[in-house]
């Protein structure tokens, strides 16, 4: 675990993360961990689950490492579509365990298993109804830029800056987040265009679609 983590992040970051989690638990502060899954760490999920459980972590989000940032330089690390099924199975088999698992927006959508995983996390009915970026949620970056989703870093999709305009005016502008607010199933291609969930799903996670298909 340490070798894989430090190779992806930087040397020493694994032990620093463990130390931080222990300190937070000692002070009764809830913790959540996010793992971006790639071909190098997908085989370590079980070991990581046990470690996080022992550390008293409250929840664990599993997501796919997408070809953006430094990861774009390592396309060979991107998992295959069939690997997603094994991730869903892993999370499903952990329902009822000490550690709550949630599947990120880039995994799943309409299999019975991934629905059960997210319902278990939310303790409520759950159903994917398309990407909510710019429709139900927005993000504020470190420099004040307003984006529909903090994972999408294309500067052409920045809707404004909180230092220059009010959040209300940015949100209510008809020009903001048009790429997703006006998105419909006619813009989908390939299997997504033919899927029976097309109208409801709208192609899944926008960032996944953007990173992989452009």
Residue positions per predicted region:
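Short cysteine/histidine-rich metal-coordination sites, predominantly Zn2+-binding motifs
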Residues: 208-214
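Radical SAM/AdoMet-radical enzyme domain recognition
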Residues: 1-80
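C-terminal accessory region of radical SAM enzymes
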Residues: 82-119, 145-196, 202
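Short, basic/aromatic recognition patches
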Residues: 117-131
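Short, acidic, Ser/Thr-enriched surface-loop or helix-capping motifs
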Residues: 140-141
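Iron-sulfur cluster-binding electron-transfer modules in prokaryotic oxidoreductases
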Residues: 51-69, 91, 104-108, 113-114, ...
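Short, small/polar residue-rich loop motifs at catalytic or cofactor-binding pockets
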Residues: 131-135, 156
């Amino acid at each position: 675990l340490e070798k894989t983590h430090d190779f992806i992040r930087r040397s020493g970051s694994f032990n620093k993360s463990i130390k931080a989690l222990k300190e937070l638990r000692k002070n009764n502060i809830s913790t959540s961990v996010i793992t971006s899954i790639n071909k190098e760490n997908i085989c370590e999920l079980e070991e990581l689950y046990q470690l996080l459980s022992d550390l008293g972590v409250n929840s664990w989000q599993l997501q796919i490492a997408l070809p953006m940032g430094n990861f774009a330089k390592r396309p060979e690390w991107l998992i295959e579509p069939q690997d997603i099924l094994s991730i869903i199975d892993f999370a499903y088999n952990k329902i009822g365990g000490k550690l709550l698992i949630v599947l990120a927006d880039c995994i799943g959508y309409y299999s019975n298993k991934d629905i059960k995983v997210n319902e278990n996390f939310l303790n409520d009915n759950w159903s994917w109804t398309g990407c909510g970026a710019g429709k139900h949620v927005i993000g504020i970056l470190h420099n004040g830029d307003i984006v529909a989703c903090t994972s999408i870093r294309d500067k052409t999709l920045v809707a404004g800056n909180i230092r220059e305009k009010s959040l209300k005016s940015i949100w209510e502008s008809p020009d903001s987040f048009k790429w997703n607010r006006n998105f419909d199933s006619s813009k989908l291609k390939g299997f997504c265009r033919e899927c029976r969930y097309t109208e409801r799903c709208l192609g899944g996670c926008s960032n996944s679609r953007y990173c992989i298909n452009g």
